[in-house]
């Protein structure tokens, strides 16, 4: 069995294989300030004839505010009020406006472990696959049903395995790797499949680097992006879950059936950039060098961790942000922000001319601050560059690694980080 088939077998209480339809028990459900209100409304519609309108298990639900925080409109403030009230009445854990982005906060707070089946009303919920869970995004209506029953229907997905070998070259990172994979298979290359990342390259990645890989599985259509839990996973979770011990069961068996297996050698991989207006429009940085930039957004659930921002800041050194360039830095969580603060990186970036914001989704969703105007060109370490994603539909967004963002911050144009 693949690890995904094992997780669905556990969740449904019976052995299953890819293609089977199952009613699965959910281990953890997450919603946030954008999709949460509709889920709450749907929950009360489902429960309208029930005298006791309580969720199935409040200990298995997390509500977090991260998209429009602090509230940037009256409507956002009303959504926050509604969700705070719901969380209090139901006894649900609510991470308020100061904690950070859901896909960073849940793992760092110990809510995720190998073998879990996790759903979130956000498309990048697949990020938790970095810790060996099967996690996937669902809509608000499905989330309402989960709130009420703790169960959800699934078709057990086929698995598309990416075998990656070789040592990543200097200043080439997991963001470059995942962009390369997406560029290779396309935005629908693994539609409704579990993307399983394996090989010596993947095993060498830190948890933050693995989070980047799993986070972007959805950008090639993946239902999940899963990485086998190992000693790296165990070390990370032991710091967050008291008494955690790694169960070797949660990995794919030898002889497991895959829909496809692709093999890659990354020894000569160069930095990658996704060009407007699709994530699979990927080119080596050498083909887009010199593209003038108006703004760089360093952050998001894809690359907003301490490790990411440190890479950018170290490349920048003591040099200032390029003239006429806006550099927005948004750490992914309060925990990551404090690590950066204590290490001196926040002060260093502010002195360089960067705008450092409190932990949140920031410009990534295009509905808050730091938006691009018509004709402006942005470089972001986030996960999507659709037309209008970070502001005007007449703007242009390129996606890159933190290293490429750091090099480009010095020059005001897309720059190969190996050249600075």
Swiss-Prot record:
* Pathway(s) per entry: Amino-acid biosynthesis; L-leucine biosynthesis; L-leucine from 3-methyl-2-oxobutanoate: step 2/4
The residues that hold [4Fe-4S] cluster are 301, 361, 364
Q: Which InterPro entries match?
A: Acnase/IPM_dHydase_lsu_aba_1/3, Acoase/IPM_deHydtase_lsu_aba, Aconitase_4Fe-4S_BS, Aconitase_4Fe-4S_dom, HAcnase/IPMdehydase_lsu_prok, Homoacnase/IPMdehydase_lsu, IPM_dehydratase_rel_enz, IPMI_cat
Co-factor binding details: Binds 1 [4Fe-4S] cluster per subunit.
Q: What does the record give as EC number? A: 4.2.1.33
- Cite the entry's keywords alphabetically: 4Fe-4S, Amino-acid biosynthesis, Branched-chain amino acid biosynthesis, Iron, Iron-sulfur, Leucine biosynthesis, Lyase, Metal-binding
Per the record, what are the reactions this protein catalyses? (2R,3S)-3-isopropylmalate = (2S)-2-isopropylmalate
Function (record text):
Catalyzes the isomerization between 2-isopropylmalate and 3-isopropylmalate, via the formation of 2-isopropylmaleate.
Relate the assembly described in the record. Answer: Heterodimer of LeuC and LeuD.
Protein's name according to its UniProt entry: Probable 3-isopropylmalate dehydratase large subunit
Organism, by scientific name, is: Methanosarcina mazei (strain ATCC BAA-159 / DSM 3647 / Goe1 / Go1 / JCM 11833 / OCM 88) (Methanosarcina frisia)
- Gene for this protein? leuC
């Amino acid at each position: 069995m693949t690890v995904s088939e094992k997780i669905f077998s556990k969740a449904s209480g019976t052995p299953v294989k890819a293609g089977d339809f199952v009613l699965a028990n959910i281990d953890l459900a997450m919603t946030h300030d954008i999709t949460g209100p509709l889920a709450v409304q749907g929950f009360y519609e489902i429960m309208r004839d029930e005298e006791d309108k309580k969720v199935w298990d409040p200990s298995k639900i997390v509500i977090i505010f991260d998209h429009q925080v602090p509230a940037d409109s009256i409507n956002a403030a009303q959504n926050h009020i509604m969700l705070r009230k719901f969380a209090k009445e139901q006894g649900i854990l609510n991470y308020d406006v100061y904690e950070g982005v859901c896909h960073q906060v849940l793992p760092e707070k110990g809510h995720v472990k190998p073998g879990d089946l996790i759903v979130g009303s956000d498309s990048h919920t697949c990020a938790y696959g970095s810790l060996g869970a099967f996690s996937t995004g669902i809509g608000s209506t499905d989330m309402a049903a989960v709130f009420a029953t703790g169960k959800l229907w699934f078709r057990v997905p086929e698995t598309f395995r990416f075998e990656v070998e070789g040592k990543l070259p200097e200043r080439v990172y997991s963001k470059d790797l995942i962009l390369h994979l997406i560029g290779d298979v396309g935005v629908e290359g693994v539609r409704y499949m579990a993307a399983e990342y394996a090989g010596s390259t993947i095993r060498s990645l830190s948890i933050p680097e693995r989070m980047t890989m799993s986070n972007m599985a959805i950008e090639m259509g993946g239902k999940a992006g899963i990485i086998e839990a190992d000693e790296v996973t165990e070390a990370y979770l032991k710091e967050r879950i008291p008494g955690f011990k790694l169960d070797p069961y949660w990995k794919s068996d030898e002889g497991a059936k895959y829909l496809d297996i692709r093999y890659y050698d990354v020894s000569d991989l160069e930095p990658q950039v996704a060009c407007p207006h699709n994530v699979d429009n990927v080119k080596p940085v050498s083909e887009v060098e010199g593209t003038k930039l108006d703004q760089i957004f360093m952050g998001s659930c894809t690359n907003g961790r301490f490790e990411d921002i440190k890479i950018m800041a170290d490349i920048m050194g003591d040099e200032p942000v390029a003239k006429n360039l806006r550099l927005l830095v948004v750490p992914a969580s309060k925990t990551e922000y404090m690590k950066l603060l204590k290490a001196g990186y926040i002060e260093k970036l502010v002195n360089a001319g960067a705008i450092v914001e409190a932990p949140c989704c920031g410009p990534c969703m295009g509905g808050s601050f730091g938006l691009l105007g018509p004709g402006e060109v942005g470089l972001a370490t986030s996960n999507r560059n659709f037309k209008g994603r970070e502001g005007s539909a007449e703007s242009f967004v390129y996606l890159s690694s933190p290293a490429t963002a750091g090099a480009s911050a010095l020059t005001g144009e897309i720059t190969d980080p190996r050249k600075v």
